[in-house]
């Protein structure tokens, strides 16, 4: 069965971006619920002994929705950092090439996240076919992985991600999010996306050790 991963940072380390109470609900309640739901849905099925990556790429309906939400949240937590981190020269060059400048990437990313209608996720992902970085909106539980694109960065724009601290001010939440991006992690994702493609997603998920022995 699957278990809830621990946060990779202290709940009180994000300043005025997100509060410990927000993490108590978002991680401790919402994320935990997706784990519980998936365990209940796969019990006694062919997916019961499958990896999260296998479920994510081979399932549909409620099983997919809950598996995807587990992965999406896992990835979101790793995209956050209490303090600013530097992006690699390789990623910097790629963003400048694909978007014109780092400032333009930020502008496009925040605009995309702001205008995403309803609940969902806003991503930067590596397109294995074009070998370029794209900004992608996904609704509800959808993820670029199912379109064979490798996630590099994500922000959660479900209301439960920001309502406790920022009410309906999604743009304020997004601006503060950008000041807490773990660019070291994003840079690693880009490096491995170019080397291993979707295999890097499978490796990342397995490294989280969701499964009980």
From Swiss-Prot:
It catalyses: 2 superoxide + 2 H(+) = H2O2 + O2. It comes from the Bacteria. It is an enzyme of class 1 (oxidoreductase). Its cofactor is Fe cation. Its EC number is 1.15.1.1. Fe cation binds at residues 26, 73, 156, 160. Binds 1 Fe cation per subunit. One of its GO terms (molecular function) is superoxide dismutase activity. Keywords: Iron, Metal-binding, Oxidoreductase. It holds the Pfam family Sod_Fe_C. Signal peptide: none annotated. Homodimer. Destroys superoxide anion radicals which are normally produced within the cells and which are toxic to biological systems. Belongs to the iron/manganese superoxide dismutase family. This is Superoxide dismutase [Fe]. It comes from Helicobacter pylori (strain J99 / ATCC 700824) (Campylobacter pylori J99). The gene is sodB.
